[in-house]
Regions:
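Hydrophobic alpha-helical transmembrane segments
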Residues: 1-61, 65-66, 99, 136-141, 168-169, 235-275, ...
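Central hydrophobic cores of alpha-helical transmembrane segments
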Residues: 25-28, 168-178
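Secretory targeting signals
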Residues: 34-66, 104-165
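Terminal transmembrane helical anchor/hairpin motif
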Residues: 37, 41, 180-259, 263
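Membrane-interface alpha-helices at helix entry/exit sites of multi-pass transporters
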Residues: 93-107
């Protein structure tokens, strides 16, 4: 059994467990609801681009936890049950198992997110009569990449852990640390350096710190896509944007968060005693 075979099996198993359709339904429902929010806020002018921005904000919170749930037991669950020893006896290498499970689970999450966003795109057209295609396609692709990044994190966690309970603990910690609590660190650094909390205009390094998490990088890229790559940043820092705030830098951060956990997970998994 090779990694493509493992990837296909992971994808088929996810279809059988309705994981794909759960992702589609949840993302379609939440992003479609966000598309109509501007109609309910009197101070906000109804606009399809604003609706896409709202959908990306919902996605930044929902996608990480969905991707982690989809993948955190991919290796740890089979390791605890003993079925992983059977799989490794077929025989794929441990690296092939990790790559196959990442591609299979990552494919399920990415396809589910794309389908969910397509539904919300139809809803947006129905509400606003049109859709800014470039912004929509770009946001959809970024959201799929965010999902794949957290699948990489989840597979890395799963490869490093021997039990379901430990994998779950680390997955929850990753979600809290990289999504809900990350901004506390840049704000605390700003307070220590300047003696005050961030205001309307902030130093450029603060935006870099905020964007060092996969969710922060996603938010920075989505904002650049919807508002213009330089406009939003220059307004926030009150001057020209340095090179390290270029969208390419944040894209690289997301790719690092996708691949580095896999490498770390593989190094631990390669030495693990499965007996």
């Amino acid at each position: 059994m090779t990694w493509p075979t493992i990837a296909r099996k992971e994808f088929a198993d996810a279809l059988g467990s309705r994981m794909l359709w759960a992702i589609v339904i949840i993302i379609a429902l939440m992003t479609s609801l966000s598309a109509g929010l501007s109609l309910l806020i009197p101070e906000m002018e109804p606009d399809a681009a604003v609706a896409i921005g709202g959908a990306s904000q919902f996605a930044a919170l929902l996608v990480p936890i969905m991707a982690l749930i989809a993948a955190y037991l991919a290796i740890a669950g089979e390791r605890e049950s003993g079925s992983l020893k059977v799989l490794l006896g077929l025989p794929p290498s441990r690296g092939e198992v990790l790559v196959g499970k990442f591609l299979g689970r990552g494919g399920v999450v990415a396809i589910g997110l794309v389908l969910g966003f397509l539904v919300s795109g139809v809803v947006t057209v129905a509400i606003y009569g049109g859709l800014p295609l470039t912004a929509f396609v770009g946001t959809t692709a970024l959201t799929a990449l965010l999902g794949v990044s957290f699948v990489g994190i989840a597979i890395g966690i799963s490869a490093l852990t021997a039990t379901r309970a430990r994998a779950m603990t680390l997955a929850i910690t990753a979600y809290l640390g990289l999504t809900l609590l990350w901004d506390l660190v840049p704000n605390a650094v700003h307070l220590l350096v300047t003696g005050e909390m961030p205001g309307q205009v902030v130093p450029a390094w603060l935006l870099l710190l905020q964007g060092l998490s996969p969710t922060g990088a996603y938010n920075a890229l989505a904002q650049a896509l919807l508002l213009g790559s330089g406009t939003a940043v220059e307004a926030r820092i009150g001057g020209p944007a340095p090179a390290y705030l270029h969208p390419g830098a944040f894209l690289a951060i997301m790719l690092v968060w996708t691949l580095l956990p896999l490498v770390v997970g593989y190094l631990g998994f390669r030495r693990a005693d499965l007996s």
